Protein backbone atom coordinates (compact mmCIF):
# COMPACT_ATOMS: atom_id res chain seq x y z
CA UNK A 1 0.00 0.00 0.00
CA UNK A 2 1.41 3.44 -0.97
CA UNK A 3 2.55 5.77 1.80
CA UNK A 4 1.90 9.41 0.93
CA UNK A 5 3.57 11.86 3.29
CA UNK A 6 2.32 15.46 3.31
CA UNK A 7 4.67 18.09 4.73
CA UNK A 8 3.21 21.57 5.10
CA UNK A 9 4.34 24.78 6.75
CA UNK A 10 5.17 28.45 6.17
CA UNK A 11 8.07 29.77 4.09
CA UNK A 12 11.47 28.86 5.55
CA UNK A 13 10.18 26.31 8.06
CA UNK A 14 12.53 23.66 6.67
CA UNK A 15 9.99 21.84 4.49
CA UNK A 16 12.18 21.44 1.43
CA UNK A 17 15.30 20.20 3.23
CA UNK A 18 13.30 17.87 5.47
CA UNK A 19 11.20 16.51 2.60
CA UNK A 20 14.25 15.80 0.42
CA UNK A 21 16.17 14.02 3.18
CA UNK A 22 13.09 12.11 4.29
CA UNK A 23 12.43 10.89 0.76
CA UNK A 24 16.09 9.82 0.44
CA UNK A 25 15.95 8.00 3.79
CA UNK A 26 12.81 6.12 2.75
CA UNK A 27 13.87 5.59 -0.86
CA UNK A 28 10.71 7.17 -2.27
CA UNK A 29 9.83 10.02 -4.64
CA UNK A 30 9.88 13.70 -3.57
CA UNK A 31 7.70 16.49 -4.97
CA UNK A 32 8.35 20.18 -4.26
CA UNK A 33 5.00 21.87 -4.95
CA UNK A 34 6.37 25.25 -3.86
CA UNK A 35 8.73 25.18 -6.85
CA UNK A 36 5.71 24.62 -9.10
CA UNK A 37 4.04 27.78 -7.77
CA UNK A 38 7.29 29.68 -8.22
CA UNK A 39 7.48 28.48 -11.83
CA UNK A 40 3.93 29.66 -12.50
CA UNK A 41 4.75 32.95 -10.72
CA UNK A 42 7.81 33.39 -12.95
CA UNK A 43 5.86 32.62 -16.13
CA UNK A 44 2.84 34.80 -15.38
CA UNK A 45 4.96 37.72 -14.13
CA UNK A 46 7.07 37.56 -17.30
CA UNK A 47 3.85 37.82 -19.30
CA UNK A 48 2.29 40.58 -17.12
CA UNK A 49 -0.87 38.53 -16.53
CA UNK A 50 -3.48 39.83 -14.07
CA UNK A 51 -7.09 38.78 -14.74
CA UNK A 52 -8.43 35.25 -14.17
CA UNK A 53 -9.35 35.07 -17.86
CA UNK A 54 -5.77 35.90 -18.89
CA UNK A 55 -4.40 33.45 -16.33
CA UNK A 56 -6.57 30.61 -17.66
CA UNK A 57 -5.50 31.39 -21.22
CA UNK A 58 -1.81 31.47 -20.31
CA UNK A 59 -2.02 28.27 -18.25
CA UNK A 60 -3.20 26.46 -21.39
CA UNK A 61 0.11 27.45 -23.00
CA UNK A 62 2.09 26.32 -19.95
CA UNK A 63 3.64 22.88 -19.63
CA UNK A 64 5.50 21.97 -16.44
CA UNK A 65 7.47 18.73 -16.55
CA UNK A 66 9.77 17.04 -14.05
CA UNK A 67 12.72 14.85 -15.07
CA UNK A 68 15.89 13.68 -13.28
CA UNK A 69 15.30 16.03 -10.36
CA UNK A 70 14.76 19.10 -12.53
CA UNK A 71 11.66 21.10 -13.46
CA UNK A 72 11.15 22.29 -17.02
CA UNK A 73 8.90 25.15 -18.15
CA UNK A 74 7.84 24.59 -21.77
CA UNK A 75 11.10 22.69 -22.30
CA UNK A 76 13.25 25.33 -20.56
CA UNK A 77 15.22 24.02 -17.58
CA UNK A 78 14.40 25.93 -14.40
CA UNK A 79 17.15 26.69 -11.87
CA UNK A 80 17.81 29.20 -9.11
CA UNK A 81 15.97 32.01 -10.92
CA UNK A 82 12.78 30.91 -9.15
CA UNK A 83 14.39 31.08 -5.67
CA UNK A 84 14.64 34.87 -5.36
CA UNK A 85 12.46 36.82 -2.88
CA UNK A 86 10.83 38.62 -5.83
CA UNK A 87 9.63 35.38 -7.43
CA UNK A 88 8.57 34.14 -3.99
CA UNK A 89 6.23 37.11 -3.70
CA UNK A 90 4.87 36.48 -7.22
CA UNK A 91 4.32 32.83 -6.31
CA UNK A 92 2.31 33.79 -3.24
CA UNK A 93 0.38 36.41 -5.25
CA UNK A 94 -0.70 33.98 -7.97
CA UNK A 95 -1.27 31.13 -5.50
CA UNK A 96 -4.32 33.10 -4.33
CA UNK A 97 -5.88 32.76 -7.78
CA UNK A 98 -8.31 29.87 -8.19
CA UNK A 99 -7.29 28.97 -11.80
CA UNK A 100 -3.66 28.56 -10.67
CA UNK A 101 -4.49 26.40 -7.65
CA UNK A 102 -6.87 24.20 -9.64
CA UNK A 103 -4.29 23.78 -12.41
CA UNK A 104 -1.43 22.78 -10.09
CA UNK A 105 -3.53 20.72 -7.66
CA UNK A 106 -4.64 18.51 -10.55
CA UNK A 107 -1.02 17.95 -11.63
CA UNK A 108 0.14 17.28 -8.06
CA UNK A 109 -2.61 14.73 -7.38
CA UNK A 110 -1.81 12.94 -10.62
CA UNK A 111 1.90 12.70 -9.73
CA UNK A 112 1.13 11.42 -6.21
CA UNK A 113 -1.46 8.89 -7.32
CA UNK A 114 -0.75 5.25 -6.41
CA UNK A 115 2.83 5.68 -5.23
CA UNK A 116 4.75 6.27 -2.02
CA UNK A 117 5.86 9.89 -2.08
CA UNK A 118 6.83 12.87 0.06
CA UNK A 119 4.89 15.94 -1.07
CA UNK A 120 5.88 19.30 0.35
CA UNK A 121 3.94 22.57 0.22
CA UNK A 122 1.38 24.72 2.00
CA UNK A 123 -1.95 22.97 1.40
CA UNK A 124 -0.96 19.33 0.86
CA UNK A 125 -2.59 17.87 3.97
CA UNK A 126 -5.69 20.05 3.69
CA UNK A 127 -6.39 20.26 -0.06
CA UNK A 128 -4.06 18.31 -2.37
CA UNK A 129 -3.84 15.05 -0.40
CA UNK A 130 -6.38 15.28 2.45
CA UNK A 131 -6.28 11.47 2.74
CA UNK A 132 -2.46 11.23 2.98
CA UNK A 133 -1.28 8.48 5.32
CA UNK A 134 1.10 10.85 7.16
CA UNK A 135 0.62 14.60 7.65
CA UNK A 136 3.30 16.83 9.16
CA UNK A 137 3.05 20.58 9.80
CA UNK A 138 6.39 22.34 10.41
CA UNK A 139 6.65 25.74 12.12
CA UNK A 140 9.47 28.02 13.33
CA UNK A 141 9.89 31.65 14.35
CA UNK A 142 10.03 34.22 11.54
CA UNK A 143 13.61 35.22 12.42
CA UNK A 144 14.80 31.60 12.46
CA UNK A 145 13.13 30.98 9.10
CA UNK A 146 14.66 34.13 7.60
CA UNK A 147 18.15 33.11 8.79
CA UNK A 148 17.77 29.68 7.18
CA UNK A 149 16.46 31.09 3.90
CA UNK A 150 19.20 33.74 3.80
CA UNK A 151 21.93 31.12 4.34
CA UNK A 152 20.39 28.92 1.65
CA UNK A 153 20.27 31.78 -0.88
CA UNK A 154 23.86 32.82 -0.11
CA UNK A 155 25.04 29.26 -0.74
CA UNK A 156 23.24 29.33 -4.10
CA UNK A 157 24.88 32.61 -5.06
CA UNK A 158 21.66 34.64 -4.97
CA UNK A 159 22.35 38.30 -4.10
CA UNK A 160 19.96 39.39 -1.36
CA UNK A 161 20.05 41.05 2.07
CA UNK A 162 18.82 39.47 5.31
CA UNK A 163 16.31 42.32 5.67
CA UNK A 164 14.84 41.51 2.24
CA UNK A 165 14.49 37.84 3.17
CA UNK A 166 12.84 38.64 6.51
CA UNK A 167 10.43 41.06 4.81
CA UNK A 168 9.51 38.36 2.30
CA UNK A 169 8.86 35.87 5.11
CA UNK A 170 6.59 38.32 6.96
CA UNK A 171 4.69 39.25 3.79
CA UNK A 172 4.28 35.65 2.63
CA UNK A 173 3.03 34.55 6.05
CA UNK A 174 0.33 37.20 5.81
CA UNK A 175 -0.59 36.37 2.20
CA UNK A 176 -0.55 32.61 2.70
CA UNK A 177 -2.66 32.60 5.85
CA UNK A 178 -5.20 35.22 4.74
CA UNK A 179 -5.93 34.14 1.16
CA UNK A 180 -9.47 32.95 0.40
CA UNK A 181 -8.35 29.96 -1.67
CA UNK A 182 -6.61 27.12 0.23
CA UNK A 183 -5.08 29.25 3.01
CA UNK A 184 -2.07 27.93 4.90
CA UNK A 185 -3.34 26.03 7.92
CA UNK A 186 -2.63 22.84 9.82
CA UNK A 187 -4.79 19.83 8.97
CA UNK A 188 -6.70 18.59 12.02
CA UNK A 189 -4.90 15.25 11.94
CA UNK A 190 -1.43 16.65 11.14
CA UNK A 191 1.43 16.37 13.62
CA UNK A 192 2.90 19.78 14.55
CA UNK A 193 6.69 20.06 14.85
CA UNK A 194 8.36 23.34 15.89
CA UNK A 195 11.76 23.29 14.19
CA UNK A 196 13.09 26.57 15.69
CA UNK A 197 15.49 24.83 18.07
CA UNK A 198 15.73 21.42 16.39
CA UNK A 199 18.41 20.18 14.03
CA UNK A 200 17.38 18.74 10.67
CA UNK A 201 18.42 15.30 11.93
CA UNK A 202 16.12 15.62 14.96
CA UNK A 203 13.18 16.63 12.77
CA UNK A 204 13.78 13.70 10.39
CA UNK A 205 14.04 11.30 13.33
CA UNK A 206 10.66 12.43 14.69
CA UNK A 207 8.96 12.09 11.32
CA UNK A 208 10.48 8.66 10.66
CA UNK A 209 8.95 7.42 13.93
CA UNK A 210 5.52 8.56 12.73
CA UNK A 211 6.01 6.98 9.31
CA UNK A 212 7.05 3.70 10.92
CA UNK A 213 3.83 3.69 12.96
CA UNK A 214 1.52 4.50 10.05
CA UNK A 215 3.13 2.95 6.97
CA UNK A 216 4.81 -0.25 5.89
CA UNK A 217 7.89 0.89 4.00
Curated annotation (Swiss-Prot):
Q: In which compartments does the protein localize?
A: Cytoplasm
UniProt record, GO biological process: pyrimidine nucleotide metabolic process
User: Can you name one GO molecular function term for this protein?
Assistant: ATP binding
UniProtKB keywords? ATP-binding, Cytoplasm, Kinase, Nucleotide-binding, Transferase
- Any idea of its EC number? 2.7.4.25
Reaction(s) this enzyme catalyzes, per UniProt = CMP + ATP = CDP + ADP; dCMP + ATP = dCDP + ADP
Q: Does the keyword ATP-binding apply?
A: yes
Q: Where does ATP bind?
A: 9-17
Q: Which InterPro entries match?
A: Cytidylate_kin (IPR003136), Cytidylate_kinase_dom (IPR011994), P-loop_NTPase (IPR027417)
Q: Which domain of life is it from?
A: Bacteria
Q: Name one GO cellular component term.
A: cytoplasm
Q: What class of enzyme is it?
A: transferase
The text of the family note is: Belongs to the cytidylate kinase family. Type 1 subfamily.
State the HAMAP family in the record. Answer: Cytidyl_kinase_type1
Q: What is this protein called?
A: Cytidylate kinase
Lineage runs: Bacteria, Thermotogati, Thermotogota, Thermotogae, Thermotogales
Encoding gene (name): cmk
Amino acid sequence: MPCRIAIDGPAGSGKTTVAKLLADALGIFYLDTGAMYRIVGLYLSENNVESDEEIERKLKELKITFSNGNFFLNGRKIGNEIRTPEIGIYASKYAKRLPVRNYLTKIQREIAKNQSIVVEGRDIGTVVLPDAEVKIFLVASQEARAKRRYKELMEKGVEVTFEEVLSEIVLRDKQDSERDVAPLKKAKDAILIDTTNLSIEEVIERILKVVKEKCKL
